Design a protein with these regions (language model features):
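Bacterial N-terminal signal peptides that target proteins for export
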Residues: 1-9
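C-terminal motif of bacterial Sec signal peptides marking the signal peptidase cleavage site
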Residues: 18-21
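Bacterial signal peptide processing site
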Residues: 23-26
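Short coil/turn motif common to extracellular beta-sandwich-like domains
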Residues: 29-36
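Structural motif
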Residues: 38-47
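Tryptophan-paired
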Residues: 49-94
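Short acidic/polar inter-strand loop motif in beta-rich domains
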Residues: 91-109, 117
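Glycine-rich, aromatic-bearing surface loops/beta-hairpins
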Residues: 106-152
């Protein structure tokens, strides 16, 4: 093998290694950790989808749900830079304000997806006690698991 062929082969090997190492992989995993609320009938204690759901974050102009039908479960975004999020929740014709107190911590999802923030639910407060809320899991992650049950 001549020096010229050797140099060309080395160049091609280096180029292909460079191109293969720089190919970005796609992220196909969920990257948002929402507080997941399943809705239940307060009378029968069975899972029941509300006829109408409206949710607005206190201090946020845009509604999360606006008289939405068929929501089950409800997904509530938490602010990783804060320790409290409050929501005005209207289920059918009953409205109440619920505040969630939590701590946030970074979590590596994968090399492709990077980091997100998971949360641990500490306490909650229902202003008018219009709904009964049961905490089924205080770990708020990207997994598809229920965190709270709202009985209405």
């Amino acid at each position: 093998m001549t020096a010229r062929h050797y140099t060309a082969a080395l160049f091609l090997a280096a180029l292909s290694a460079f191109l293969l190492s720089c190919s970005p992989e796609a992220c196909f995993e969920e990257t948002n950790a929402y507080l997941k609320a399943t809705f239940y009938s307060n009378d029968t204690k069975e899972k029941k989808t509300p006829d109408s759901l409206s949710v607005k974050g206190i201090g946020i102009a845009e509604k999360i749900y606006d008289r939405k039908e068929g929501v089950q479960p409800g997904l509530f975004p938490l602010d990783a830079s804060g320790v409290t999020c409050s929501f005005e929740i209207k289920i059918n014709d009953v409205t109440d304000t619920v505040s969630f107190h939590y701590t946030s911590y970074p979590h590596l999802i994968s090399k492709e997806c990077g980091y997100t923030f998971y949360h641990r639910l500490d306490t909650f407060f229902c202003k008018n006690e219009s709904f009964y809320i049961y905490v089924s899991s205080d770990n708020i992650t990207t997994a598809n698991e229920e965190n709270i049950r709202i009985f209405y």
